[in-house]
């Protein structure tokens, strides 16, 4: 599936055009928000309608209302899916969410070319996702440097130990995400975070991604030494996403107490 998605991205690049010049950035610090979270563990809450493996996750999809609910519940950043074909996202969702909230916004897509980096800046993203399994270490580093040169931060995502080691041999990302889901098989286990967290330099913010759906999961990944988590599907499947965030942190009364 990953190879199929990347092939689609290469097709989309054929029609991607960018106007001149690049507007002045109005960025919100992404890594800093995760280093100083509102709770013991930072939360990147995801706005996602569908996925290739699960189909439609949230039929009544209102990205702005969802993002505002996340912010009220104490999320530290918002992740917005912009891929259309496989996740039923859209670039305008990112723009709308950025205008509606006051916390950093991450563009979640399959970025493989510098033009997508510039496009992300134009859409108002504060940070972008770079997937280690989708890029050579050389290309990932080049896109990372391109992003920072125009005021964007990056969440560098890995799943395999070998991918992490190849990246760290070149540079140390400020934020490293450990995807608990194998993008080739879609098998998900928190053991991925356990296996990789200790290999990441202490200067990096470590984010655990995917498969986090309960307060028990939150306590588990925190014990592995991560500073933040990215949670989407388990929140999006709840009718009240604001209350779902409280429950995720063991705050079942919804008033912020544990």
UniProtKB/Swiss-Prot annotation:
SUPFAM superfamilies in the record: Ribulose-phoshate binding barrel (SSF51366)
Superkingdom field: Bacteria
Pathway: Amino-acid biosynthesis; L-tryptophan biosynthesis; L-tryptophan from chorismate: step 4/5
Catalysis: reaction(s): 1-(2-carboxyphenylamino)-1-deoxy-D-ribulose 5-phosphate + H(+) = (1S,2R)-1-C-(indol-3-yl)glycerol 3-phosphate + CO2 + H2O
EC number, UniProt record: 4.1.1.48
Family indicated by similarity: Belongs to the TrpC family.
Name of protein: Indole-3-glycerol phosphate synthase
Classification lineage: Bacteria, Bacillati, Bacillota, Bacilli, Bacillales
